[in-house]
């Protein structure tokens, strides 16, 4: 192995599995290199997966720990005033996970932009009559706005502190703020990924009659039961909402 990060390896294996048997993947290649947002999916997604695993380990330790104060040891007949209530381990993990998930949204939006840019023989804005129709331009605007918001939400809460209780509590973790920011990033990233799916399914239909893999074709067939191919301009947000609901079934 030339780069043995577990998340990268798992992502690469998953991509190969999902694309097995794809006619599109087997086509002769005309381009020397793909954009980073496609070529580096294992490296970027994998790093986020490694972060998720790390955060899971922190949370597993925390929920199996005693975080009371004071700590009571009945067998030793001891009551000890200590600091296990401090939320720093969780606060740092929440901030770290927010960054990792925001990056999944960030790279997803870049792929969405490439899909609507008229590259690789796809029509501009993924519609048959661009210019007359703005097609998928506005969903990409939406994704760009959301990822920009998530970047702001990635300012670490755990680097902040404010004293209370007459200075006795003079360093606090701000873990609850980190967690609420993380929750907003989770929802933002989910929406950005749904927009990418919306665009990718449209792009795949423009590749017909070539077929992708059996796994991808099955997923797209199920997706098309909820979200149609877009011929002309229409209100897009119901399709984005339907895409979110579909993602939650996977």
Predicted regions and their residues:
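C-terminal auxiliary extensions adjacent to catalytic cores
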Residues: 1-250
């Amino acid at each position: 192995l030339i780069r043995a990060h577990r998340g990268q390896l798992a992502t690469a294996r998953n991509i190969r599995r999902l694309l097995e048997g794809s006619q599109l993947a087997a086509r002769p290649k005309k381009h020397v290199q793909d954009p980073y947002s496609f070529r580096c999916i294992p490296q970027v997604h994998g790093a986020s997966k490694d972060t998720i695993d790390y955060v899971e380990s922190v949370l597993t330790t925390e929920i199996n720990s005693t975080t009371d104060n004071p700590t009571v040891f009945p067998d030793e007949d001891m009551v000890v005033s200590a600091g296990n209530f401090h939320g720093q381990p969780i606060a740092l993990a929440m901030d770290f996970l927010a960054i990792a998930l925001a990056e999944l949204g960030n790279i997803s939006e870049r792929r969405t932009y490439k899909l609507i840019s008229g590259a690789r023989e796809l029509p501009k804005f993924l519609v048959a009559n661009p210019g007359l129709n703005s097609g998928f331009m506005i969903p990409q605007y939406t994704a760009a706005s959301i990822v920009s918001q998530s970047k702001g939400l990635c300012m670490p809460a755990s680097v902040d502190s404010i004293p209370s209780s007459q200075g006795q509590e003079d360093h606090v973790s701000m873990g609850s703020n980190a967690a609420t920011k993380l929750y907003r990033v989770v929802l933002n990233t989910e929406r950005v990924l749904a927009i990418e799916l919306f665009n990718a399914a449209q792009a795949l239909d423009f590749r017909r009659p070539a077929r992708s893999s059996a796994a991808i074709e099955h997923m797209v067939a199920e997706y098309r039961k909820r979200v149609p191919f877009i011929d002309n301009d229409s209100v897009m947000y119901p399709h984005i909402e339907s895409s979110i609901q579909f993602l939650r079934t996977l």
